[in-house]
């Protein structure tokens, strides 16, 4: 028997996740100086982490030889205070929110189940679901990237186990109205997962709905507004009944001692968080006004740019040659061939982006 035959049948047809390009990759491929490259393809915080988080990492460095608490209780308590949600409804996850997605998929999805995904959106939902035997049902968003709730509800069947929603959506930046989420959740027994990775940049959040509906889950991350992408840490807000079941299959010690220390400190640093949000708001306005292509409105820390009649792949390549890393959205299902996602950077970075796009 060939060794690859040991791999589950479900894995063979799954497309590998496409990450944003790294600075090291661009330096190697284009012969650029690392200091000249700006990374605006992965929606990281251009201000970096909270100084308090860095201090906490240093202060706790000697403790990394000891296992952290199995359920990340200290971090969960800090998240509870930050969100005003009871700790009994919160799980910390690693690596990142992806760990939460993997855990939920292992918990509820089996062969023959279906999951509904509104595209274009974050591609890891599909990977986590299909790896556990699910069939993916796509519901394509409207031209303005809003969700047609009636069309989504029509896609549900008795086999639907999970519905994945992203708000603000990646890569489009728009939010799903609370009333639409409620309409979906009350019309099904399936779990409704709402990805709020970018919620700190949005006007509202829907975490409170978890306390009112027993099939809504909210996923969040420390990778964006909190500037801790390298720590790979997220969390889930879910009904108590689901948390009790989730903890049965959660990977033990899945949030490291270092990550917990940094996360707790970052949650306490409202000054750094507010600076990050303020920088994003100002940068968004500048890019929307100055970029010479159509820019969609956003409640995230990135803008979506339609470079038609050019191809996103061609424009992205030209920008890479100039040391500007952005995200070609061609790999997102149903995103088309002309969309580019640009992380909102510092004033200087944004000005460089506008100049580069203007030269296209």
Swiss-Prot record:
One of its GO terms (molecular function) is pyridoxal phosphate binding. Pathway: Amino-acid biosynthesis; L-histidine biosynthesis; L-histidine from 5-phospho-alpha-D-ribose 1-diphosphate: step 7/9. It comes from the Archaea. Keywords: Amino-acid biosynthesis, Aminotransferase, Histidine biosynthesis, Pyridoxal phosphate, Transferase. The keyword Transferase applies. It catalyses: L-histidinol phosphate + 2-oxoglutarate = 3-(imidazol-4-yl)-2-oxopropyl phosphate + L-glutamate. It is an enzyme of class 2 (transferase). GO terms for biological process: L-histidine biosynthetic process. Pfam families: Aminotran_1_2. The keyword Amino-acid biosynthesis applies. The modification N6-(pyridoxal phosphate)lysine is found at residue 224. Gene3D superfamilies: Aspartate Aminotransferase, domain 1, Type I PLP-dependent aspartate aminotransferase-like (Major domain). Its EC number is 2.6.1.9. Its cofactor is pyridoxal 5'-phosphate. Belongs to the class-II pyridoxal-phosphate-dependent aminotransferase family. Histidinol-phosphate aminotransferase subfamily. This is Histidinol-phosphate aminotransferase. It comes from Methanococcoides burtonii (strain DSM 6242 / NBRC 107633 / OCM 468 / ACE-M). The gene is hisC.
């Amino acid at each position: 028997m060939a060794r690859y035959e040991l791999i589950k049948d479900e894995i063979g047809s799954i497309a590998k996740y496409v990450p944003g390009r790294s600075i090291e990759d661009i330096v190697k491929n284009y012969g650029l100086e690392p200091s000249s490259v700006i990374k605006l393809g992965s929606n990281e915080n251009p201000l970096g982490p909270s100084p308090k988080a860095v201090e906490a990492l240093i202060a706790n460095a000697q403790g990394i030889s000891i296992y952290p608490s199995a359920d990340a209780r200290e971090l969960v308590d800090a998240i509870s205070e930050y969100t005003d949600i009871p700790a009994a409804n919160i799980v910390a996850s690693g690596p990142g929110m992806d760990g939460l997605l993997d855990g939920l998929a292992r918990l509820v999805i089996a062969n023959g189940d279906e999951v509904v995904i509104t595209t274009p959106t974050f591609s890891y939902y599909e990977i986590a679901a299909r790896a556990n035997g699910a069939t993916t049902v796509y519901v394509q968003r409207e031209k303005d990237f809003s969700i047609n709730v009636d069309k989504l509800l029509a896609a549900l069947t008795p086999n639907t186990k999970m519905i994945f929603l992203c708000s603000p959506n990646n890569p489009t930046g728009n939010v799903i109205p609370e009333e639409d989420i409620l309409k979906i959740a009350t019309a099904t027994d399936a779990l409704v997962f709402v990805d709020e990775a970018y919620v700190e940049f949005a006007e509202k959040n829907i975490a409170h709905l978890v306390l009112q509906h027993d099939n809504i889950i909210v996923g969040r991350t420390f990778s964006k507004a909190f500037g801790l992408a390298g720590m790979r840490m997220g969390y889930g807000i879910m009904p108590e009944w689901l948390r009790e079941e989730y903890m049965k299959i959660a990977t033990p010690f899945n949030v490291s001692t270092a990550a917990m220390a940094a996360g707790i400190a970052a949650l306490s640093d409202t000054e750094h968080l507010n600076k990050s949000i303020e920088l994003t708001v100002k940068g968004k306005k500048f890019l929307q006004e100055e970029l010479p292509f159509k820019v969609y409105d956003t409640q995230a820390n990135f803008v979506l740019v339609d470079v038609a009649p050019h191809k996103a792949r061609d424009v992205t390549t030209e920008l890479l040659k100039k040391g500007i890393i952005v995200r070609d959205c061609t790999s997102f299902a149903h995103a088309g061939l002309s969309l580019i996602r640009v992380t909102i950077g510092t004033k200087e970075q944004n000005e460089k982006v506008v100049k580069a796009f203007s030269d296209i």
